[in-house]
UniProtKB/Swiss-Prot annotation:
One of its GO terms (cellular component) is vacuolar membrane. This is Vacuolar membrane protease. It comes from Zygosaccharomyces rouxii (strain ATCC 2623 / CBS 732 / NBRC 1130 / NCYC 568 / NRRL Y-229). The keyword Hydrolase applies. Residues 36-355, 410-426, 481-487, 636-652, 696-950 are vacuolar. It holds the Pfam family PFF1_C. Glycans are attached at N65, N108, N718, N843, N931.
Length: 950
C-alpha cells in the first residue's frame, strides 16, 4: 500500500503536476497576503524601544494637530504649523543640554541661487526651516541628518505627505534628547518642499549642514501602507539598512531604477542632499497615487499602523547609525536590494551582480550545450530527426500563437477600458496570465495528443532558458551602460538561473539514462525487445504492472525523444521507463532473473532519475514565480495610477501588464501539457471572471477615483474674468461633469475643452469670482495685484546702445507669499537677462549673475503683510545678441508675472459679508461625483497673471 502511494506520488502525471502548481500559487498568495497584512500586527509594545508606545501616541496626536487644516507654503496656516512644531521642539530642547535649535524664520535666512530644476531659472527663498542639533558623545564621527517637510499642497491635509515623516522625526528627537547618541544628529523640519525642494536647498546653506555625512529622508507619495526604501546611495548604505532594520524591512531597487530612469515623476528632498554629497536613505509611502495630494491625504484615510511602520523603520536606522561603528571601507557602487515578505532583506553591489550575470550567461549555456552534445551522440543511431523537430517546434509555435492572442486581448482591454488599471492591477494581470497559460495548455496538449513524446519538459525548459538568456543579456548590457544603475534586474537573473538549472537537470538525467541503457544493450546483445506503450497518462495505467516487468532492454529507448510505439506487446499495458515510470516496483526480481542487467542498482538509479521532473518543477516554478510576481506586483502597484498622468505612461503600464502576464507563466509552460481537467477549468474560470471584470467594471470608484487638477486664473491682459481650468486625462470625463455644475447650468456658461500634450485635456469655464482677502468694499483685481515699473533706462540717452539695460519692477500683491517672473526670448538664441536683484524692505538686497542668462525668477517670501516685491533686472541689448544685426527699436524685454494664492477652505470678510475664498473650487468639491478627486494644478489654487514690456 505504502509503495503504491509512493509510486503514485512521484510519477509525472497530470494530478501530481496540477497539485504542485496549485500549491505553488496558494503559497505565493498566502505569502503575498502575509506581506501586506503582517506589519499591521507589529505593535510598538513589541519593539525593543521601551518608550515606543508613548512616543507613537504622541506622534499620532501631533499628526492630528498638524493636519487640522490645509497648510501649503502659500497659506497663513503654514505659519501655524511652523509655530506648533517650534513650540514642541523648544520644549524638548529645554530638557537636555545636548539639544540646540535654529529657527530660520527668526534668523531671517534667505537664499538667491540658480534653480537646478529649470533651465535658466533662479529662485529667491525666505526659509522657515527649523533645524535641531543633538550633540553626539563623539563629535569626530560624521553626523546623521534626519529630514522631513511640514508644508503640503493647497488641496491636501498632508497627513502622509509629509505629516507622518515630521511626527516620526519629533518622536526620534524626543527619544535621543533623553538618550544622547554617539554620533551627532541634525534634524531638518523643512518648509516648501512641494514647490522646488527649497527647504532642503536652504538647509545646505546652513552651517550645521557641514556636520553631517549621512541622511535619512522621510517622504510620502501615497497615503498609507508600508514605508518603502525608495533608494539608497550605494551598496554600503544598503548594507547599513540590512543590518539595522530587522523588523519589517521593506525596500526594492526597482523603485531606485525608476528614479534613475526618470520613470517616477515626483522628486524628494533626497535629490538635493545626494547632489550635495550626502549618503543615505529615501524612505516614503508610495501608494495609492490617485489620493496623493488630494483631500483624502488626511488622518481619516491613514492609520497608526502605517505611521508606526515609518517611525519604526527610521528609528531602527537612526539607532544603528547613531550607536554602532560603521565600516569606513565604503563601496560607492549602486546597490541591488529587496526584501522577502518583510522577513529578510538582501542587498548586494550592482557591479557584483554584473559579474555574476557575465558568469551565468557563459557557464550555464556551456554546461547545457555539453550535455546536449553527449545526449545527441548517445542516441543518434536510432534518432528520429523528423520527430525531434516536431518536438522542438512545439513550444515556439505555442508561445508565438499565445503571444499574438495575448497582445490582441491586451489591446482590446486597453482600448475598451483604458483606465481599469487605475482601479487595480491584479485583475488585468491575472486575466492576461491565465489566458496565456490556457492558450499554451490547449496547443501543447493538442500536440501531445497527436504525437505523444517523452521528456518534452526538458526540451521546453531549454527553450525557455534560451529566451530568458536573451532577456538577461540585454539587461546585463543595460546594467553596464547605465554605470550599474539598472538595479531592478535581479528578478530576470533569478528567472534565467533557475529555469536553466532545471533544464540542465533534465539533460543530466538523459545522459545518465543513456549510459546505463548502452551498458544494458552491450550485456544483452540482441535479446532486447522493443519498448511499447500506448502513450497514455499514468492515471490510465494499473498499479498491478511492475516496473521491472519492463526488461532492461527497454532502457535502450528510454533516452530517445522519439514517438512512443503504440503497437502492443504480450503485455497490453506497460509503464514508461522514462519520466512516467514508478519509483519502486512491486516484487522486484533478482539479478539472475534479468540476464541483460549486471547491477540492479543501475535500474534503481534510472528509476530515481526518471523522477527528475519533480526536482525540475520545484527548481523552475515556485521560487521564480514568487520573485517574478513580487517584481511585477511592486512595479504595477507603484505605476498603475500614473496612467492618469499621460498617454505615454498609459502605454508603458499596459506593456508592463502584458510582459508581467508572460513572465509569470514562463516557468510553468514546460509542464502545461500535464495539467489535469480540474486545473484547466480553474484557469478558465479565473480567466473568464477577471476578463469580464476588466470589461464591465467602472475604472474609477470612491476609493480609486479619477484624479483631476484645478486652478483658477485671472489674466489681466484678457480681462478680469476668473477662468476655471480643470486638467485631466482625455476620455470624455471632464466636460459632462462640468456641464452639470449649478453655476454653469443656471448662467448658461460655456464649457470648452482643448487637447493638451501627452493625452491630457483641459476644460475651461468662467467661475465665481475669488475672495482671497478681507476688504471693506468689493474686491477688484487691482486691489489684489498690480505691477509698477519703478525705473527703466532703456530709452536713456546717456546709455550707450551697447550697454546693459537696467530696470526695476515693483509687484504689489496682498495676502501673498509667492510669484514667478518669466523672461521671454523671442527671436533670440540666448536669454538676454544676465543679472537679477531682489531688494528688501531694510534697503539690503540679494544679487545673482549669469553669463548664460536667466529665463525665470521664482520669488518666495514669508511675510504676508509685506505687500510688494522689488526686483532689479539687467539685460543685454539685442545688438549684442544677434550677431551684429542692429535692431535699435526692439530692445524691450517681454516678461510675464504670475502670483499665487493657496488658501480655499476659509472665509474672507468682504464688504461686511463672510465669503468663501474660492467658491468656484467649493462648487466643484460639492457637486462632483464621489469617484473624482482634486489636486492642485499650479503652486496655488488661484493665480493672477499679467504680461508687460520693459
Amino acid at each position: 500500500m505504502f509503495v503504491d502511494f509512493l509510486r503514485s506520488l512521484f510519477r509525472l502525471r497530470k494530478t501530481n503536476v496540477s497539485i504542485l502548481l496549485l500549491l505553488t500559487y496558494l503559497t505565493v498568495g498566502l505569502i503575498y497576503f502575509y506581506d501586506h497584512e503582517h506589519y499591521k500586527h507589529v505593535t510598538p509594545e513589541q519593539s525593543r524601544f521601551k518608550d515606543a508606545p508613548q512616543l507613537v501616541e504622541d506622534a499620532w496626536l501631533n499628526l492630528q494637530n498638524i493636519t487640522y487644516s490645509y497648510h501649503p507654503y502659500f497659506s497663513r496656516d503654514n505659519n501655524r504649523v511652523h509655530d506648533y512644531l517650534l513650540n514642541k521642539i523648544e520644549a524638548i530642547a529645554q530638557r537636555s543640554v545636548h539639544v540646540s535649535v535654529s529657527d530660520d524664520a527668526s534668523n531671517n535666512r534667505s537664499v538667491l541661487l540658480r534653480n537646478s530644476f529649470v533651465d535658466g531659472g533662479a529662485v529667491y527663498f525666505e526659509s522657515s526651516n527649523i533645524v535641531v542639533k543633538i550633540e553626539g558623545k563623539n563629535t569626530d564621527l560624521p553626523g546623521l541628518l534626519l529630514s522631513a517637510h511640514y508644508d503640503g499642497v493647497p488641496t491636501s491635509h498632508g497627513a502622509t505627505d509629509d505629516g507622518k515623516g515630521v511626527v516620526s522625526l519629533l518622536g526620534i528627537l524626543d527619544h535621543y534628547s533623553r538618550h544622547q547618541p554617539e554620533r551627532t544628529l541634525v534634524f531638518n523640519f523643512n518648509n516648501n518642499e512641494e514647490f522646488g525642494l527649497l527647504g532642503a536647498v536652504a538647509f545646505m546653506e546652513h552651517p550645521w549642514s557641514k556636520l553631517v555625512h549621512y541622511v535619512i529622508n522621510l517622504e510620502g507619495t501615497g497615503i498609507g501602507g508600508k514605508a518603502v526604501l525608495f533608494r539608497t546611495s550605494d551598496v554600503s548604505t544598503a548594507k547599513i539598512y540590512q543590518n539595522a532594520v530587522k523588523s519589517n524591512p521593506f525596500g526594492n531597487s526597482l523603485f531606485q531604477q525608476g528614479f534613475y530612469e526618470g520613470g517616477v515623476g515626483s522628486e524628494t528632498d533626497y535629490r538635493i542632499y545626494e547632489s550635495n554629497g550626502l549618503r543615505g536613505f529615501d524612505i516614503a509611502f508610495y501608494k495609492p497615487r490617485d489620493l496623493y495630494h488630494t483631500t483624502k491625504d488626511s488622518v481619516q484615510y491613514t492609520s497608526r499602523e502605517a505611521l508606526w511602520h515609518m517611525f519604526h523603520t527610521a528609528w531602527q536606522l537612526t539607532e544603528y547609525i547613531a550607536r554602532e561603528p560603521i565600516d569606513n571601507d565604503d563601496d560607492f557602487t549602486p546597490a541591488v536590494f529587496f526584501d522577502v515578505a518583510g522577513l529578510f532583506f538582501f542587498s548586494t553591489s550592482s557591479k557584483t551582480l554584473f559579474k555574476w550575470c557575465c558568469v551565468i550567461l557563459v557557464v550555464l549555456p556551456v554546461i547545457a550545450f555539453n550535455f546536449d552534445v553527449i545526449s545527441f551522440s548517445q542516441k543518434r543511431s536510432s534518432y528520429n530527426q523528423r520527430h525531434r523537430w516536431g518536438v522542438s517546434i512545439r513550444l515556439p509555435l505555442s508561445f508565438a500563437s499565445s503571444l499574438l492572442l495575448l497582445r490582441f486581448t491586451e489591446r482590446l482591454l486597453s482600448s475598451h477600458n483604458t483606465f481599469i488599471l487605475s482601479r487595480g492591477h491584479l485583475t488585468p494581470l491575472i486575466a492576461l496570465a491565465t489566458e496565456f497559460i490556457l492558450s499554451n495548455y490547449l496547443i501543447l496538449s493538442f500536440f501531445e495528443y497527436l504525437l505523444p513524446t517523452r521528456d518534452f519538459k526538458t526540451t521546453a525548459l531549454r527553450q525557455v532558458a534560451i529566451l530568458t538568456w536573451i532577456v538577461l543579456f540585454v539587461c546585463t548590457m543595460k546594467l553596464y551602460k547605465s554605470e550599474y544603475k539598472y538595479t531592478g534586474i535581479y528578478g530576470i537573473v533569478i528567472l534565467y538561473s533557475f529555469v536553466s538549472l532545471a533544464g540542465i537537470i533534465g539533460l543530466f538525467g538523459r545522459v545518465l539514462k543513456g549510459n546505463i541503457s548502452r551498458e544494458s544493450t552491450d550485456n544483452k546483445g540482441d535479446s532486447s525487445r522493443p519498448y511499447g506503450s500506448h502513450g497514455v497518462d499514468e492515471e490510465q495505467q494499473r498499479s498491478g504492472t511492475s516496473a521491472i516487468e519492463e526488461s532492461a532492454g527497454n532502457l535502450e529507448d528510454s533516452n530517445n525523444e522519439g514517438p512512443l510505439d503504440v503497437s502492443t506487446t504480450n503485455n497490453s499495458e506497460h509503464i514508461d521507463a522514462e519520466e512516467r515510470a514508478p519509483l519502486l516496483g512491486s516484487n522486484p526480481p533478482s539479478v539472475a532473473d534479468q540476464p541483460g542487467i549486471t547491477n540492479t542498482l543501475k535500474i534503481k538509479a534510472v528509476s530515481v532519475v526518471n523522477y527528475d521532473w519533480s526536482l525540475q518543477f520545484l527548481i523552475a516554478v515556485p521560487i521564480t514565480t514568487f520573485i517574478v510576481f513580487g517584481c511585477v506586483d511592486l512595479g504595477l502597484d507603484a505605476l498603475k495610477q500614473t496612467i492618469q498622468e499621460g498617454a505615454v505612461a498609459t502605454v508603458h503600464v499596459w506593456n508592463l501588464v502584458f510582459l508581467g502576464g508572460i513572465l509569470l507563466t514562463l516557468p510553468v509552460l514546460p509542464f502545461a501539457y500535464k495539467f489535469n481537467y480540474l486545473t484547466a477549468m480553474s484557469f478558465l474560470v479565473a480567466f473568464a471572471t477577471t476578463l469580464s471584470l476588466c470589461f464591465l467594471q467602472s475604472p474609477f470608484t470612491e476609493g480609486a477615483p479619477l484624479k483631476v487638477r484645478f486652478s483658477q486664473e485671472i489674466n489681466i491682459n484678457n480681462g478680469t474674468d476668473a477662468i476655471v481650468n480643470v486638467y485631466g486625462r482625455k476620455g470624455g470625463f471632464l466636460q459632462p461633469m462640468l456641464q452639470d455644475l449649478p453655476s454653469v447650468k443656471q448662467m448658461s456658461k460655456d464649457v470648452w475643452c482643448q487637447d493638451e500634450l501627452n493625452g491630457m485635456e483641459r476644460c475651461l469655464y468662467v467661475g465665481y469670482q475669488p475672495n482671497p482677502l478681507d476688504s471693506q468694499r468689493p474686491v477688484s483685481t487691482e486691489d489684489i495685484f498690480s505691477l509698477k515699473v519703478v525705473s527703466n533706462d532703456k530709452n536713456d540717452h546717456d546709455r550707450s546702445r551697447y550697454a546693459p539695460i537696467n530696470a526695476e519692477l515693483e509687484i504689489n500683491v496682498r495676502e501673498n507669499r509667492g510669484c514667478t517672473l518669466w523672461f521671454k526670448n523671442q527671436h533670440l538664441d540666448r536669454p538676454p537677462v544676465r543679472q537679477l536683484t531682489v531688494r528688501h524692505s531694510d534697503n539690503t538686497s540679494d544679487l545673482i549673475k549669469s553669463s548664460q542668462g536667466f529665463t525665470q525668477l521664482q520669488l518666495h517670501k514669508l511675510d504676508f503683510d509685506q505687500q510688494k516685491y522689488r526686483v532689479g533686472i539687467q539685460w543685454l541689448p539685442k545688438i549684442l545678441l544677434m550677431d551684429g544685426q542692429e535692431d535699435e527699436d526692439n530692445d524691450q524685454l517681454d516678461m510675464q508675472v504670475t502670483c499665487y494664492w493657496g488658501e480655499y477652505d476659509s472665509e474672507s470678510l468682504v464688504n461686511g459679508q463672510h465669503l468663501r475664498k474660492l467658491p468656484a473650487f467649493d462648487e466643484l468639491l460639492q457637486y462632483s461625483p464621489l469617484n473624482v478627486s482634486y489636486a492642485n494644478r499650479d503652486r496655488g489654487l488661484l493665480t493672477i497673471t499679467q504680461s508687460i514690456e520693459l
